[in-house]
């Protein structure tokens, strides 16, 4: 799913530079998306002969990708990966530690500030781009069945768009309408009882006795007293009768005028006992059914974020970090962004895209209690590794790297050779439109014609942009691409 504009934003943000035997450029373009959620790093001389190029494809907001871009270079530098006996293990630990750092209280405050800065203030009653995105998401989700929405948000809490979608579609209208009617009936009944209160004291006594009996039998006395317990993730909603149906139903023990003979009292008492017993059984079933509903798929709706999306919990970013040294290149990747090396015209993948349907990813997701539906984790994220997204990382029995969504990167170390020409690091907005070899051919051809790295990056974004949003979404995503060439003459 995604929110799109009526026409793409094709203005590009650019960065370029050179030094220490290489030249580089980066282009980022918003495209058809309502918001630009990508971020990147181009850091020459991160340490001595090491340079860092990273692409961070954000989702659910810009805050985690921007935070990563601002903090990760120093975070890696402090760990002195270049001195590590096992560089891969060092970088993997650094990524997981950084993900832990993201959920720290101070970091969460900073993420919120970043998110707030990215929301333009409203003027003249016009909605900002974030509101527009929410509006479009709500419209899209309104056409999705309730059960599917519950699956989608089951492990990640429920956002404001989901609640709006429920109301827009009316999937919960049956129970809610019944509850509203019951509440109205209860209010009318309360009014009637108040009017009769001074006229007939004995009726009041009967009602109080009935309520006392309900408490002794274990039935709830009033609304709002059912227990909400923390529950595991569920994939389907369990339909149950609203508790208010039983609670607001007229009591068989209420009496009419509060006057009865001893014989009538005995008969009524027997009838009342039988009726109350049946009602107690029904109440117990209703209460159990309601608790099952709370303990099941509706738990995120009732116990989740209360409609407010939390930065770092409901947002995240991929991270494809390319560390270029004097004689080798190291890539640490978490997510579906990608780094590719051109070696004598041939594409050499320096990373592997992480998708939920991959065997390794599927096994971890299932082990953490998650599900995969239509290529999405719990029907939500269509990727399986990322910084942030801590709403998917709530299994208390597992460490961060073992959660449904993990920041643990794959690390590849590749020795550089004289045949190596350039490296491309980009988000899936590029790779969904072109294969690795297609990108290498495209870039190599332009470089051979004398184009600069910046011109190459611009052209690649334009080539991948879709003409419309009528297709499957290919070419409609944010685009960020970094191209780094090796200057052999300066070495």
From Swiss-Prot:
Q: Which UniProt keywords apply?
A: Hydrolase, Magnesium, Manganese, Metal-binding, Protein phosphatase
User: Pfam families from the xrefs?
Assistant: PP2C (PF00481)
Acidic residues: compositionally biased ranges: 173-192, 260-294
Query: Which PROSITE patterns does the entry mention?
Result: PPM_1 (PS01032), PPM_2 (PS51746)
The UniProt record gives the binding positions of Mn(2+) 1 as 57-58
- Do you know which Gene3D superfamilies this protein is assigned to? PPM-type phosphatase domain
Q: Which GO BP terms sit in this record?
A: signal transduction
InterPro entries the record matches? PP2C, PP2C_BS, PPM-type-like_dom_sf, PPM-type_phosphatase-like_dom
Domain PPM-type phosphatase: from-to ranges:
23-486
Residues covered by region (Disordered):
112-136, 170-294
Task: Give residue spans, biased composition: Basic and acidic residues.
Answer: 112-125
Family the UniProt entry places it in: Belongs to the PP2C family.
Q: Could you tell me which PANTHER family the record lists for this protein?
A: PROTEIN PHOSPHATASE 1G, PROTEIN PHOSPHATASE 2C
Protein's name according to its UniProt entry? Protein phosphatase ppm-1.G
Organism this protein belongs to:
Caenorhabditis elegans
